Structure formats: C-alpha cells, structure tokens
C-alpha cells in the first residue's frame, strides 16, 4: 500500500462528497397524508421547502395535526434513507483505497 497516495484519495473523496451534497440539495422528497390533504416537501439536506394543507382541514385541528405529523415523519424518513444511500455509495468508492 502506497501511503503517499492517501492524501490525494482523501482530497478526491472530499471533493466528491461536496459535489454530492450540492446535487442533493436540489433533490426534492415529497410526502403526503390524509389522501393528499397534507403535503410536505424536503430538499435533500432535510430542509422543509414546501407545505400544503387542504383548506377543509383548517377547521379540524386534530386531523390536521395527525396528517402533518404523518407527512413530516414520512418526509424525514425519505431524506434519511437518501442520505444513507449516498453514504453507502461513497463508502463503495473506498474500494479504490485497497488498490493503493
């Protein structure tokens, strides 16, 4: 193993990770609940970027809370799953390390 190439490999991975993070920011994950009465959208870094609530729910606070929690939880899970997949893809590239 040639440790002199390790720095270059790490720099390359850091650059690739930054590019993936930037690209991931543009990815949108949308979750709906209550048959579409509530819709939330997160970008790939977990920021809530859109929230839609059907007007009919404005008079039913309890239902709105339940649907909001459900949609938010599903959206959060989608973002986390996407992050995990990106991390596994990055780790897959560590196979290049063994070739050094």
Swiss-Prot record:
GO cellular component term of the entry, any: bacterial nucleoid
Molecular function terms, GO-annotated: DNA binding
Keywords, ordered alphabetically: Cytoplasm, DNA-binding
Subcellular location: Cytoplasm, Nucleoid
SUPFAM superfamilies registered for this protein in UniProt: YbaB-like
InterPro entries noted in UniProt: YbaB-like_sf (IPR036894), YbaB/EbfC (IPR004401)
Cited Pfam families: YbaB_DNA_bd (PF02575)
Chief location of this protein within or outside the cell: cytoplasm
Similarity remark: Belongs to the YbaB/EbfC family.
Assembly, per entry: Homodimer.
HAMAP family from the UniProt entry: DNA_YbaB_EbfC
Family annotation (NCBIfam families): DNA_YbaB_EbfC (TIGR00103)
Summary of the function given for this chain in its UniProt record: Binds to DNA and alters its conformation. May be involved in regulation of gene expression, nucleoid organization and DNA protection.
Name used for this protein in its record: Nucleoid-associated protein HPSH_00175
């Amino acid at each position: 193993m040639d440790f002199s190439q390790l720095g270059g490999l790490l720099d390359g991975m850091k650059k690739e990770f930054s590019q993936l993070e930037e690209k991931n920011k543009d990815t949108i994950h949308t979750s709906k609940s209550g048959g579409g009465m509530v819709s939330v959208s997160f970008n790939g870094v977990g920021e809530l970027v859109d929230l839609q609530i059907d007007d009919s729910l404005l008079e039913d606070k309890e239902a709105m809370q339940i649907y909001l929690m459900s949609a938010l939880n599903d959206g959060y899970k989608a973002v986390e799953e996407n992050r995990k997949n990106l991390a596994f893809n990055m780790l897959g590239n560590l196979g290049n390390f063994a070739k050094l």
